[in-house]
């Protein structure tokens, strides 16, 4: 089975974080989700055994 990851750029208390949510067949695998302060570190972690399917910048939607 192929694992997919969506990476979200979010802002928590004025700090940017990149959160990866891992899925198999649209079911989130919460214990494999990962977060870090850099996109590169997050992508490197999930690319070990996942395909990145989406990148969503949630900071652009904040008002």
Question: Predicted regions span which residues?
Answer:
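A short, structured beta-strand/loop element
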Residues: 14-32
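A short, charged, amphipathic alpha-helix used as a generic interaction element across diverse proteins
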Residues: 27, 34-59
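Short intrinsically disordered terminal tails
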Residues: 1, 59-63
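Short N-terminal "domain-start" leader segments
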Residues: 1-19
């Amino acid at each position: 089975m192929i694992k997919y990851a969506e990476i979200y750029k979010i802002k928590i208390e004025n700090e940017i974080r990149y959160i990866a949510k891992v899925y198999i067949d649209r079911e989130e695998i919460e214990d494999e989700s990962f977060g870090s302060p850099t996109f590169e570190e997050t992508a490197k972690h999930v690319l070990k055994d996942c395909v990145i399917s989406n990148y969503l910048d949630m900071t652009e939607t904040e008002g």
